[in-house]
């Protein structure tokens, strides 16, 4: 289709605020943010789920009633879920505290005047997909007092729906988001019963207290959305297996993971597309729930992360076997560290504060710093509200640059990568022949 501006395709049918179905106890009124929480800007983690077969379509004359019914079902289950996820129904009091005042989460009901396939099959899908996210909201700096959770349900002319969630990064990471989505979708599926009660564990500042380093002022996102673009790349199972076999043979690394080979390839190609190739650094984020002693459960809610990194100072460093070998070495080192006392993410934040710059900004003097968030094995494609698995899960386009997000592809053992780069760099990156060899 000739893609129209979102304003010409989208009509908002309803906007409301969903409060927890029961009041939050006064003993839980204030949620303390950890040092890592405070180091993050007031941005959202935006994601959307596309469900092409929701239910048998009603007659066109009743189409608006169908949207109302779906919205009511989701609102009711969200209200029940927020009882357990009470900080997301509150407001930021300051950069150290969430006031869990039960003000509620914002909920939008939207009609989109096209079919879902026109969005999913669009040649610029990463841009087109953003139509199901609240306008101007994803990755935005939601100032103190803003909503910490915003949900939008969008109904297409074909009868399919998309459910998008903008989830405050101040309170939780990608694993926290998945916990919330699994709990909310489970409550929605089982809406005829009242036995299911989600049981997230909010960690707050119990692991990474601010007592050692002091409180932080909220950092701001400085990148310009108009200068940053996102591309969706699919690494099919067969091509990914070939890449892993090639790297294993040339590097000596036993069973290189999907994330290792894909992130190394993206780093190599992005660096090559940059106007200033070297020196460069690749920073991987780590979920440390199972690395902390005692281990934290998977339902722990918070920003429970660390980092490890590799560097490239010459052309030999940029060869795939070398990159993967170095990634394997550094992740093994990370697993041997005390991720509370020797947390590299905290050390980077503290060092950045000392130098008066943002984290990862010219890190250790490296002009090109790329970050990678690996969500492979996080089962986003199993989030089922009662209409089966989603056809696609997408991440909102944002003002980040030099960022890679990896997650499972919907079928097999493939990987879907979302790559965010500067416009000019992206135009060179997407023509890289080595990259094109391994993507669909």
From Swiss-Prot:
GO MF entries: aminoacyltransferase activity
Free-text function comment from the UniProt entry: Involved in the biosynthesis of capsaicinoids and capsinoids natural products, pungent alkaloids synthesized from phenylpropanoid intermediates in the placental tissue of chili pepper fruit acting as repellant on herbivorous mammals and conferring spiciness to hot peppers. Catalyzes the biosynthesis of capsaicin, a pungent component, and of capsiate, a non-pungent component, from vanillylamine and vanillyl alcohol, respectively. Can transfer an acyl from 8-methylnon-6-enoyl-CoA to vanillylamine forming capsaicin and CoA.
The family this protein is said to belong to: Belongs to the plant acyltransferase family.
A Pfam family assignment: Transferase
Domain of life per record: Eukaryota
Gene Ontology biological process terms in this record: alkaloid biosynthetic process
Keyword Nucleotide-binding part of the UniProt annotation: no
Active-site residue list: 169 (proton acceptor), 384 (proton acceptor)
Broad EC category: transferase
Keywords (A to Z) from UniProt: Acyltransferase, Transferase
Name of the encoding gene: PUN1
Name of the protein in question: Acyltransferase Pun1
Catalytic activity, as annotated: vanillylamine + (6E)-8-methylnon-6-enoyl-CoA = capsaicin + CoA + H(+); (6E)-8-methylnon-6-enoyl-CoA + 4-hydroxy-3-methoxy-benzenemethanol = capsiate + CoA
Enzyme Commission code(s) on record: 2.3.2.35
Signal peptide annotation: none
Annotated organism of origin: Capsicum frutescens (Cayenne pepper)
């Amino acid at each position: 289709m000739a893609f129209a501006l979102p304003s010409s395709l989208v009509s908002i049918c309803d906007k409301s605020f969903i409060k927890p179905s029961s009041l939050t106890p006064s003993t839980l009124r204030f949620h303390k943010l950890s040092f890592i929480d405070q180091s993050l800007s007031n941005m959202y983690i935006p994601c959307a789920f596309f469900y092409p077969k929701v239910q048998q379509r009603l007659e066109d004359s009743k189409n608006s009633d169908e949207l109302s019914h779906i919205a009511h079902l989701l609102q009711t289950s969200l209200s029940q879920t927020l009882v357990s996820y009470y900080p997301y129904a509150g407001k930021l009091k300051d950069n150290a505290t969430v006031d869990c005042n039960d003000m509620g989460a914002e909920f939008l009901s939207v009609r989109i005047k096209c079919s879902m396939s026109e969005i999913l099959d669009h040649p610029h899908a990463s841009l087109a997909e953003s139509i199901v996210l609240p306008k101007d909201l994803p990755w935005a700096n939601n100032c103190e007092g803003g909503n910490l959770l915003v949900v939008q349900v969008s109904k297409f002319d074909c009868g399919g729906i998309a459910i998008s969630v903008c989830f405050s990064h101040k309170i939780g990471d990608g694993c926290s988001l998945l916990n919330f989505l699994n709990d909310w979708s489970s409550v929605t599926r089982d809406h005829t019963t009242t036995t299911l009660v989600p049981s997230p564990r909010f960690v707050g500042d119990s692991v990474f207290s601010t007592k050692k380093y002091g409180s932080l002022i909220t950092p701001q996102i400085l990148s310009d959305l108009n200068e940053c673009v996102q591309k969706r790349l699919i690494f099919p199972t067969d091509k990914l297996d070939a890449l892993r076999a090639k790297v294993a043979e040339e590097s000596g690394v036993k069973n290189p993971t999907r994330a290792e080979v894909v992130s190394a390839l993206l780093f190599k190609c992005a660096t090559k597309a940059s106007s200033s190739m070297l020196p460069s650094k690749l920073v991987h984020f780590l979920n440390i729930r199972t690395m902390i002693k005692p281990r934290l459960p998977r339902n722990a809610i918070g920003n429970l992360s660390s980092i490890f990194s590799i560097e490239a100072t010459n052309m030999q460093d940029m060869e795939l076997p070398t990159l993967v070998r170095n990634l394997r070495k550094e992740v093994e080192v990370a697993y041997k560290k005390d991720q509370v006392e020797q947390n590299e993410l905290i050390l980077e934040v503290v060092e950045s504060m000392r130098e008066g710059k943002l984290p990862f900004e010219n890190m250790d003097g490296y002009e090109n710093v790329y970050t990678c968030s690996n969500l492979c094995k996080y089962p986003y494609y199993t989030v089922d509200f009662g209409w089966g698995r989603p056809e696609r899960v997408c991440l909102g386009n944002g003002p980040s640059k030099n960022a890679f997000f990896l997650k499972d592809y919907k079928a097999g053992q493939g990987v879907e990568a979302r790559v965010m780069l500067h416009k000019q760099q992206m135009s060179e990156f997407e023509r890289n022949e080595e990259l094109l060899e391994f993507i669909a």
